[in-house]
Amino acid sequence: GLHSNGYTLINDMLWRHKLSYKDSHIGKGTPELLTPTTIYSPLIDYLLNEIPILGMAHITGGGLVENLPRVMPKGLTAHVDYNSWKMPEIFSKIMLAGEIPEEEMKRVFNLGIGFCIIVPPDVNGIDNDIECWEIGEVRCD
């Protein structure tokens, strides 16, 4: 979900189009707007003892575009496959209602990915209660 991120852009968009949360299709039937941010620390505490973690990034303002590079050593780049997970519907609604370009959506919102861990390629699947995906790979520049 939104993870407490992007509400400024949503509010600006609603003001521009003279809409309210109540009257817009963004607010109607959209529990994602009120869903609390997931707390990842219990999962990370567990995983630190189970698998080698090479990097971690909480995906907040700046989306994957700005947050993943912050945890990458010089010379390495994250290559994200934005088709590797199903983006929650709230982001499509925001993009459509606000006429927000896809690249701006990638810079502002997490698009459904709230936290990333970087693991060696031989780590296959992580068994936990939080849905997760392999979303890309790390490459040398």
Each predicted region: which residue ranges?
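Loop-centered beta-sheet repeat module
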Residues: 1-7
